[in-house]
Amino acid sequence: MGTSSARPAVLALAGLALLLLLCLGPGDVSGNKLKKMLQKREGPVPSKTNVAVSEHTAKEFLGGLKRAKRQLWDRTRPEVQQWYQQFLYMGFDEAKFEDDVNYWLNRNQNGHDYYGDYYQRHYDEDAAIGPRSREGFRHGASVNYDDY
């Protein structure tokens, strides 16, 4: 009876010894893994890197860098010249083309354009349920009079 109760204790002790041997003993060629892990944890605190320029000067320099706005209708680009020629070939005159280009380029700059975000609403005016605000738009007419 005494031998059977000692057997688990011996097995536990042998397992613990094996575990300690694996952890503390030399691993592969690189050496003791546990010691290396502990040394990494206790490693020297990295010192602050010396920089040639002050933070203020660097931010001032980087703040001045702005990406150039991409100009879609830049006439020096060959594809724009090709578009222009195609528009003229399709029958658009130069003044109409310039007018259209100016309209689309300046569309969002002048507040409430008629076809901007305020006046034109895309919903069915003959639908059973109208717009959410009754005062906003007329509802139920078969013609959207706001567009005429």
From Swiss-Prot:
Tissue-wise expression: Expressed in the brain, with expression in the choroid plexus and the ventricular ependymal cells (at protein level).
Propeptide: 32-68, 133-148
UniProt entry tagged with the keyword Signal: yes
Subcellular location: Secreted; Cytoplasm; Apical cell membrane
Pfam family, one: Augurin
Inducers of expression: Decreased expression in the choroid plexus after penetrating injury in the central nervous system.
An example Gene Ontology CC term for this record: extracellular space
Similarity remark: Belongs to the augurin family.
Role this protein plays: Probable hormone that may attenuate cell proliferation and induce senescence of oligodendrocyte and neural precursor cells in the central nervous system. ECRG4-induced senescence is characterized by G1 arrest, RB1 dephosphorylation and accelerated CCND1 and CCND3 proteasomal degradation.
Protein name: Augurin
Organism listed in the record: Rattus norvegicus (Rat)
UniProt lineage: Eukaryota, Metazoa, Chordata, Craniata, Vertebrata
